[in-house]
């Protein structure tokens, strides 16, 4: 009887070990493409994203989460570092697309600071990748509760790029 007890105990432990090993699995999700950052030190990941050519040259790279959108405006697709807060050709903004009384934040000439780095532009696959960080100023100077917003550790990775479509052939 004691032998049966020890056998059952070993059998029980073996079943538990097998069950635990079988229930462990790796759920690896690759986040490709991606547009994410820390917004005021809180993780922020876009649900939708795009990169589009603009009529005067350059590109808009944007990521949206619900009604909130981050837009990076760059004068070219050249892989390099673009400094924000110097001019209006290179700018970053954050806003709520549908809110009437929500603040809108932007960088521009002598306004805000930061940088956008294009690390890769793959013309064959039509994707763009890079990093960003910026502090954008509230466009409503009277809003003392929300003077600025800061995005750090920002990454856009393999965002689909749409070139400017010319309908005049």
Which residues does each predicted region cover?
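Sec-dependent signal peptide recognition
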Residues: 9-14
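Surface-exposed helix/loop patches within compact recognition domains
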Residues: 35-39, 43-47, 52-127, 137-139
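C-terminal or internal capping secondary-structure element at the end of a domain, subdomain, or sheet
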Residues: 121-169
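Acidic, metal-coordinating catalytic segment for phosphate/diphosphate chemistry
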Residues: 32
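Short, Lys/Arg-enriched N-terminal segments with co-localized hydrophobic residues
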Residues: 1-7
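Bacterial signal peptide processing site
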Residues: 25-27
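C-terminal motif of bacterial Sec signal peptides marking the signal peptidase cleavage site
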Residues: 20-23
């Amino acid at each position: 009887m004691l032998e049966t007890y020890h056998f059952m105990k070993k059998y029980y432990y073996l079943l538990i070990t097998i069950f635990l090993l079988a229930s462990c699995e790796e759920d690896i999700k690759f986040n490709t493409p991606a547009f994410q950052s820390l917004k005021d030190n809180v993780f922020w990941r876009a649900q939708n994203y795009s990169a589009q050519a603009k009529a005067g040259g350059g590109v808009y790279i944007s990521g949206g989460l619900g009604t909130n959108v981050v837009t990076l405006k760059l004068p070219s697709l050249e892989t390099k570092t673009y400094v924000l807060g110097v001019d209006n050709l290179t700018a970053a903004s954050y806003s709520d697309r549908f809110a009437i009384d929500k603040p809108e934040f932007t960088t521009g000439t002598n306004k805000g600071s930061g940088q956008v780095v294009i690390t890769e532009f793959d013309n064959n696959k039509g994707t763009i990748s890079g990093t960003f960080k910026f502090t954008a100023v509230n466009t409503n100077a009277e809003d003392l509760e929300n003077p600025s917003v800061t995005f750090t550790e920002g990454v856009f990775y393999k965002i689909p790029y749409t070139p400017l479509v010319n309908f005049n052939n």
